[in-house]
Amino acid sequence: PFDLVLLDRDGTLNVRVEGGYVTRPDELVLLPGAARAVADLSGVGAPVVLVTNQRGIARGLMDRGDLVEVHARLAELLAPAGGRIDAVAVCPHDRDACTCRKPLDGLFREVLGRAPWADPRRSVMIGDMPTDLEPATRLGMRAESVGPQSPIDRVVARLLAADRACDGPSDVRRGEGHVP
């Protein structure tokens, strides 16, 4: 089993707005299979953490309240399939304005710092861009790429099947501290 599951948002769970940002809940459209994939990941017992760059905040296109509403809508869309997001780590900064914006690893280090029981080698990051995966790889996490030819539901099914085959019976850690 995994200690942590990290997910990118735009292009991984929801349709990416080309040249723009998801700034309102009604603009959030899940990709096919995303709700089922998150439900399957939620079922392994590891916290599921959204790790997302949201430069639209720095650009004044939205504020943190808008982002909270978008993420509340995401939770509503995932819930019927049994999926959940346990925590959200956001970089609201513009490029070159911080150390947390992917492909830097500040957000990943923050998540790991709040989950001291989690071993990066037993954690996975799923994203659609190389910039999503680079920090995970640097920190020793497994990195899985999704996209039109590798939709998230297929990637997750393969990932979980491989994990079950390697580990045998699971010893899922429940309640040993979730990322706040």
What are these language model-derived features?
Residues P1-V49:
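Active-site neighborhood of HAD-like aspartate-dependent phosphohydrolases
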Residues P1-D3, R64-A87, R95-M125, M129-P180:
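Asp-based, Mg2+/Mn2+-dependent phosphohydrolase catalytic module
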Residues A34, V38-H71, D86-D96, A136:
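Substrate-recognition element of Asp-dependent hydrolases with the DxDx(T/V) motif
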Residues E18, N53-Q54, P148:
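Active-site loop/turn elements of alpha/beta-hydrolase fold enzymes
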Residues D10, N53-Q54, D128:
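Short, well-ordered beta-to-alpha junction loops that form the rim of enzyme active sites
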Residues N14-R16, R59, E134:
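Conserved protein kinase catalytic core
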